[in-house]
Amino acid sequence: MKVSHCIMPLWLFAAVSTVPAQDNMKAFPPAEAGMVRHVLQLPKQEDESLAKVELIVGKQVKIDPINTYFFSGQIESENIEGWGFTRYLVKQLGPMAGTLIGVDPDEPKVLRFITLGGEPFLIRYNSRLPVVVYVPEGAEVRFRIWNTTSESSSMKKG
């Protein structure tokens, strides 16, 4: 009798932990008017503590090929009440700013991906939950996976 009490909770835990990732999407509301929801399901890695995900939000813009440009705005993280999941939100993209290097007016414009300004936005790598980002219509969400090893190096005293 005692054994069955022990096995039942383990069985229940195993059933709950194998719920498909699609079921987790129920926690994330649909995008509001003027916004688009982007979803990334990460593949499982052997040691996910050694990886990070960089979220990159921007837009394709036809501009000169010389100056450096960026959009104002920021990625915010919000906790979803009752679920404990995090969603990421960019409320507005822009205005665009950049350097003012003189450009030949006859120089043809090129299509470039212009991102939000500021530091890279890194989040924990977690293949068990989707990464969900809400952005204004017309914006694009890209990502990079950053990996390292478990080795570390000592710094010299100085």
Which residues fall in each region the model found?
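Positively charged n-region of N-terminal signal peptides that target proteins for export
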Residues: 1-5
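Bacterial N-terminal signal peptides
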Residues: 7-15
